[in-house]
Amino acid sequence: MSQITLIILVLAIGFSCTKSHPINSTRDGEDSGTDLKNLLTEPANTTYATNSTLTRKELNSTIQPERNDEGSAIRKIMASKKDENITGQSEINTSAKSQPINSTRDGEDSGTDLKNLLTEPANTTYATNSTLTRKELNSSIPPERNDEGSAIRKIMASKKDEIITGQSEINTIAKSQPINSTRDGEDSGTDLKNLLTEPANTTYATNSTLTRKELNSSIPPERNDEGSAIRKIMASKKDEIITGQSEINTIAKSQPINSTRDGEDSGTDLKNLLTELANTTYLTNSTLTRKELNSTIQPERNDEGSAIRKIMASKKDENITGQSEINTSAKSQPINSTRDGEDSGTDLKNLLTDPANTTYATNSTLTRKELNSTIQPERNDETSAIRKIMASRKDENVTGQSEFNISTNSNLNTTTHHEDAVVSPTEKVYVPNNASSAELNVSSTIQPKEADVTTSSANDIKKPAFPYCIILITFQIVTVGMIIYLVFRTMRKPCQSERAIPLNSFGFGNNSSYE
């Protein structure tokens, strides 16, 4: 009788160590008055599906489970935070939901306090085989694996915002956003001080033949079979989406302070801009199976038909689209800003990603090596078109196509009247091959600016001189004429006095002799 009582007491204590539902919380993340400030991980509506043949060794406890034998359960370690639960079992399909308060799925700021939200996996699916052994399963938060089965050991770094992750085939770029910074660089007044993990632009490239040894788990880990699906984790930021698939080419951008896209100083305060992901291209094969595709936050192709998965980026006006054949013209022009980094007096403080008139033309046969998605992108195969970047002037249109004809107005240094003049080449005309799509600015070519303040001044243009020379020549002619006249008059007087004129008694000439 005492043994039966003891067994009942042990079972009652075991059932009491379960995770209660969060108060006033809904599955769809709508605000129901719940204080999620200190909630780290709250899996809700968790379903445990285990086989009846599993023994005590193959099941484990949740909160602080210790399993040390070879029976193949998952060892979970209770993290340091009091509100974090780690759960593992042999076959589990968990849709863990812990939506932030007043937060929208598309990442628009709705005044949510995400201060202490560390990891929020949303709609996470755990699919493990019951035949997996202890070696093929691993733990998540601070996972400890010490046998020869070769799982990947994750160590939680000392810094609260630092995650150290290692695996055999993975290219991960870890993101740790600064305080009061959103994904698009606009200050949204959010205190992200205690956000621990923000991986941005993580690339998962796995083959269907990869084994458990070649896959690993990150903070909320959690693919453990050989099928090799890609696990998506919802980052702590409400407006950050991390996406990975079998073949992905992601370029992560990390802007320096006071720097433009090409690194020239434009007086811009980009202090808190950490990652600028622009024009990401996702290339997947149509032969990928369900295992090789995964679901993101708004996921959402899971069969083998290979549709295109679209992900809404954090910026409400920025779309990141991936498909096998993509031709995207992303437009998000900065105000008075130059793509080439010349200072145009523009405040680029909150401009995070400004792809301008970018054209992607790829062939369906291009491989992952032949595609890339840089900010100022560049051609890598022999069939692709030429991508042009927006030039410095705000009134200049840049068009990219395979054949590009640039007609630049040069220095003429002459006018129609053949008078020397200074003409500045301030207007550039880009003439594409497709005449139907080209619109030329006639005023900028036929009537170029003659006196631009940046290149010439009013003193540089020669004005017509006042006709002083004509007056001087006239004066000289008159002077010479007067001199000649006086000389000839003087020479004529002795000729007139050759005859002697007799004088009378009065001293006057007597003219009587002439009579």
Swiss-Prot record:
Where is this protein localized, as stated in its record? Host membrane
Which N-terminal residues, if any, form the signal peptide?
1-20
* Record's keyword terms, sorted: Glycoprotein, Host membrane, Host-virus interaction, Inhibition of host innate immune response by virus, Membrane, Signal, Transmembrane, Transmembrane helix, Viral immunoevasion
UniProt-recorded name of the protein: Mucin-like protein Glc1.8b
Which segments sit on the Cytoplasmic face? 489-515
User: What is this protein for, i.e. what is its function?
Assistant: Involved in suppression of the insect cellular immune response. Inhibits host hemocyte adhesion and phagocytosis.
Single GO BP term: symbiont-mediated suppression of host innate immune response
**Keyword match 4Fe-4S:** no
Q: Which family does it belong to?
A: Belongs to the polydnaviridae Glc1.8 protein family.
**Glycan attachment sites:** 24, 45, 51, 60, 85, 93, 102, 123, 129, 138, 180, 201, 207, 216, 258, 279, 285, 294, 319, 327, 336, 357, 363, 372, 397, 405, 413, 434, 441
Q: What membrane topology is given?
A: Single-pass membrane protein
Give the transmembrane region(s). 468-488
Q: Where is the composition biased (Polar residues)?
A: 86-104, 320-338
According to the UniProt topology, which residue ranges lie Extracellular? 21-467
Superkingdom to which the source organism belongs = Viruses
Keyword Glycoprotein present in the record's keywords: the answer is yes
Q: Which GO terms describe its cellular component?
A: host cell membrane; membrane
Annotated region described as Disordered, given as residue ranges:
80-114, 314-358, 393-413
